[in-house]
Amino acid sequence: MILLSSNNIQSFPFSITKVIKEKTGIVCRNYEKAETYGVDISAFGSEDAIIQNFRGRFIIFFNDAPYIMNERKKFSLGHEFGHYMMNHDLNNKSDYSLYEVEANFFAAQLLMPEQVINELRRRGMQITQEYLQRWFGVSKSAAKKRIETLRKVDYTHRTDEEKEMDNYIVSKFQDFINKIAPISNSFLAYDTYDEEKMQNERDHWY
């Protein structure tokens, strides 16, 4: 679990390039540097980022153009990181669409962990697109998609192992959570384990 094991993820937002290098040794280079490696980026048709095997080692090339927001660059890097961590064979065209969905989910969970978001929601925070953009440093489209995705998750049937993992993640990021959502007396009296009630509230997120 990268969220728990990474020394470079102690709060949000964080440096995605440092996490990638820490966990894989992969370096990230902008598209301008691609020529140095003999890589023709235009041949891959990706405007944002691409992971390539160069002489036995992987490199993630990304578009560092000024017209692309840093938040979008960060998500694109997380997306390519996801492809690597899940051992996706990107030459397998029949499963490519599935791989894209999985890589998007990987990046979203890394940059905006559902466990942290759910804890913030329990503390009375209104989880809006703007809220995620502000505190997690993500793009408008990534924040919007994250809310839409989490609304579809049914948390009423979490296993004991999943709940334990949730608690570990919330515990690690307690300082960040307390900073943006201090515990109030009303929260202390709230039944945080009433998952059915929480699920009903999530259904009304916007």
Predicted regions: what they are:
Residues M1-Y206:
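Active-site hotspot residues in diverse enzymes, especially metal/ion-binding acidic/histidine motifs
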